[in-house]
Every structure is written in C-alpha cells, then in structure tokens.
Amino acid sequence: DFIIFFIFMFFSPSCILSQTLQESGPGTVKPSESLRLTCTVSGFELSSYHMHWIRQPPGKGLEWIGVIATGGSTAIADSLKNRVTITKDNGKKQVYLQMNGMEVKDTAMYYCAREYASGYNFDYWGQGTMVTVTS
C-alpha cells in the first residue's frame, strides 16, 4: 500500500504540474506614460479561470483593478475604467494589464490572481511586481 501511495504522490499530474503565476514589468515609469504588465501562468489553462489584477500602494490596503473572464470579457474598477485595459493570450498563457496616464499615486505592488470560485475568491497569487512612478 505504501508503494502505491508513493507512486501516486510523486507521479500524479497534480503533483507534477505546480500552478504558478509570475508578474513582470518595467519597474519604473514616468508620469503620463503608459504601463504594461504581464502575468505568465503555468500548470493550468487560462481559458478555464477568471484572472484578476490587484495592487497595493505603499502603506495602504489592497485595491482591486479588474478581471478578465474565461471568455475574454472584462470588468474594471470604476475609478480606473478610463485608463485600464486587461487582455490575455491563452496560447502564451499570459494576462496583460495596460494602464495609461500613469500618476505618482499609481506607485504600488501589482499582483495577478486566479479566481477559483465566484465571489472574488483567489486561490493562487503571483509574487507581485513593484511599479514606481517617478520623473
């Protein structure tokens, strides 16, 4: 029984395919410039999950930016609706955040997260990428 358990634990797909999210971006942008961030995922199919962008300014709480659904439709926070676009490429396993007209107050750690059930429940987060807006 132990041998069967050992084989199952170490060779089952769920153990082999770790599920990760990794954000990447420029690090620093100037005021009025545009920001483009990429979230690269592995271990699961983007087409099966809603993906969110969230940020946390220094010393403040988390702020939801927006979501792209499995079919590609998006919802953006009202305060950012005119500045943010979220897209994805299922084949490349990448989700993109485009934010225009960057301001100093947009300085924050930016995260992508996977929604596993309706109601903004997140089971996997990236480690985040820091974006600093400075001249």
From Swiss-Prot:
Domain Ig-like: where?
Answer: 20-128
Q: Does the keyword Secreted apply?
A: no
Q: Which UniProt keywords apply?
A: Adaptive immunity, Immunity, Immunoglobulin, Signal
* Cellular component aspect of the GO annotation: extracellular region; immunoglobulin complex
InterPro entries the UniProt entry points to = Ig-like_dom, Ig-like_dom_sf, Ig-like_fold, Ig_sub, Ig_V-set, IgHV
Question: Could you tell me the superkingdom of the organism this chain comes from?
Answer: Eukaryota
What's a Pfam family this protein contains? V-set
Instruction: Give GO terms: molecular function aspect only.
Output: antigen binding
Gene Ontology BP terms: immunoglobulin mediated immune response
Tell me the first and last residues of the signal peptide.
1-18
Under what name is this protein listed?
A: Ig heavy chain V region XIG14
Species the sequence originates in = Xenopus laevis (African clawed frog)
